């Protein structure tokens, strides 16, 4: 009799086949009872006499599947088929979820970059042009200018070798819009034009003009920067006396106000040109629109400094009218940016306002020239309308008082002989005329000269004090006594603050 375990295993395998018929299922149910006796199965088939042979064959075939031998089971139905069933039930669901997630997630488009190679060619061309420009600028002559603090970085050779007029041709005139004087800039323009012609459609590449080493539109920003002392290259050029460099720097200035930049001691390029006795540079600066009334830290203008130094050419450069040739040259050189009003006013008025400017000591140009004994300077100033009777700001002395104080007979004779507007009776702030001042100073020779020229011989007062001055003197002594800090120190060892 078969064991119940094998019968149950056979029943389980039979239920896994879903495509079997109902008759086969009924035979499978009878299989456990007939498995022990094969003859009984034949009897059973004999009982089913009404069935056809095909049905009988199907029943026998079903028996073979229902009751297999122990060695006939390959595990195909129990193992792989069952795993395939589970995989068919689970895996499709996970795949469908992955597909849904992929469809719901947005797809990022990757940009497509098309390199035509034109940009690389332009960059190589720019590098080659920069190398050529660097070679052109580094081939400077032995007398090239070198400025302080590396202020000449990038200065091309044309700036150093430029002149006001060279063989009748104008150099570096910024007023000409079509000017292509910088070699590097012309090369860049030609290369840009060739690139545009080579690629007229402009498809796939963007062509732009590469910047030159020095942009002529903002070159003044580089050449008008101040160093640690506040000096610009124009200041340094005025000190060195290089007229050509000064003219080139002036042409770069878009406005005359750049010519009035002051250094740390409030000196403009015009001040430095006066201190170094550069009349030609002073004339060029004035024609270009430089302001002659700017003061330094002591209140001196360029004319004050020239009067102190006794430089006649510099004084003439600051006071004489401009000729027609100079005005025409100024308009030709600097007319593109110079203030026409400034040029016209300088050419028809001889700077009378500058002649009467006082410095911070209250002295005018005539006082400074008289103190230094520069008769020629005084002659120039008087010929241009300077006030010879002007009083200085401290004590009210005139140039005649200064000549008497210094016992300068030559200066006194010049004032008395050549200055028609000289007033001998002009008094100081103390009310002393020139003759009275000579009496107080015990200048007998000067008194005789003044008497011969018609000065009033009024003696000065014997004393400047009256009865009230004695009381004032007593008050002064009282103040000197109690105002002395040592007085309070001796008073119980105190000090002025504790006693007060």
Swiss-Prot record:
An example Gene Ontology CC term for this record: neuromuscular junction
Nucleotide-binding keyword on record: no
Composition-biased stretches (Acidic residues): 118-130
A Pfam match: Ank
Any GO MF annotation of the entry: NF-kappaB binding
Residues carrying Phosphoserine: 45, 144, 395
Tissues where this protein is expressed: Expressed in ovary (at protein level).
Gene3D superfamilies (alphabetical): Ankyrin repeat-containing domain
BP GO terms, sorted: antimicrobial humoral response; dorsal appendage formation; dorsal/ventral axis specification; dorsal/ventral pattern formation; negative regulation of antifungal peptide production; negative regulation of canonical NF-kappaB signal transduction; negative regulation of hemocyte differentiation; negative regulation of Toll signaling pathway
ANK repeats: 229-261, 265-294, 298-327, 361-390, 395-424
Record PANTHER family: NF-KAPPA-B INHIBITOR ALPHA, NF-KAPPA-B INHIBITOR CACTUS
Name the UniProt record assigns to this protein: NF-kappa-B inhibitor cactus
Species the sequence originates in: Drosophila melanogaster (Fruit fly)
């Amino acid at each position: 009799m078969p064991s119940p375990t094998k019968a149950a295993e056979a029943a389980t395998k039979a239920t896994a086949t879903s495509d079997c018929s109902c008759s086969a299922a009924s035979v499978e149910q009878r299989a456990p009872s007939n498995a022990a006796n094969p003859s009984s199965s034949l009897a059973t088939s004999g009982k089913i006499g009404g069935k056809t042979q095909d049905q009988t064959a199907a029943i026998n075939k079903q028996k073979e599947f229902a009751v297999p031998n122990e060695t006939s089971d390959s595990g195909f139905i129990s193992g792989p088929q069952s795993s395939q069933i589970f995989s068919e039930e689970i895996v499709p669901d996970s795949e469908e979820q992955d597909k849904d997630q992929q469809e719901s997630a947005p797809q990022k488009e990757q940009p497509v970059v098309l390199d035509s190679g034109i940009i690389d060619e332009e960059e190589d061309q720019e590098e080659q042009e920069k190398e050529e420009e660097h070679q052109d600028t580094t081939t400077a002559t032995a007398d090239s200018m070198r400025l302080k603090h590396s202020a000449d970085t990038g200065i091309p050779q044309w700036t150093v070798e430029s002149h006001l007029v060279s063989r009748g041709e104008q150099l570096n005139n910024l007023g000409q819009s079509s000017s292509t004087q910088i070699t590097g800039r012309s090369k860049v323009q030609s290369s840009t034009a060739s690139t545009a012609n080579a690629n007229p459609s402009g498809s796939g590449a963007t062509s732009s003009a590469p910047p030159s080493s020095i942009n002529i539109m903002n070159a003044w920003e580089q050449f008008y920067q101040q160093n640690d002392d506040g000096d610009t290259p124009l200041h340094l050029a005025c000190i060195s006396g290089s007229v050509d460099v000064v003219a080139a720097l002036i042409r770069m200035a878009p406005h005359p106000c750049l010519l009035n930049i002051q250094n740390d001691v409030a000196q403009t390029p015009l001040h430095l040109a006066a201190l170094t006795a550069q009349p030609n540079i002073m004339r060029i600066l004035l024609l270009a629109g430089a302001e002659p009334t700017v003061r330094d830290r002591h209140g001196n203008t360029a004319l004050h400094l020239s009067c102190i130094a006794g430089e006649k050419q510099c004084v003439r450069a600051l006071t004489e009218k401009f000729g027609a040739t100079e005005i025409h040259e100024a308009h030709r050189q600097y007319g593109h940016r110079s203030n026409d009003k400034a040029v016209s006013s300088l050419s028809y008025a001889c700077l009378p306002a500058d002649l009467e400017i006082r410095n911070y000591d209250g002295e005018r140009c005539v006082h400074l020239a008289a103190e230094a004994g520069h008769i020629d300077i005084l002659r120039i100033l008087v010929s241009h309308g300077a006030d010879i009777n002007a009083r200085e700001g401290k004590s009210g002395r005139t140039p005649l008082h200064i000549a008497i104080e210094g016992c300068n007979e030559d200066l006194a004779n010049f004032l008395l002989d050549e200055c028609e507007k000289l007033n001998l009776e002009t008094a100081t702030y103390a009310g002393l005329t020139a003759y009275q001042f000579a009496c107080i100073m015990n200048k007998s020779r000067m008194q005789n000269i003044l008497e011969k020229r018609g000065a009033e011989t009024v003696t000065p007062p014997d004393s400047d004090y009256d009865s009230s001055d004695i009381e004032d003197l007593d008050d002064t002594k009282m103040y000197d006594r109690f105002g002395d800090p040592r007085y309070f120190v001796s008073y119980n060892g105190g000090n002025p603050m504790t006693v007060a």
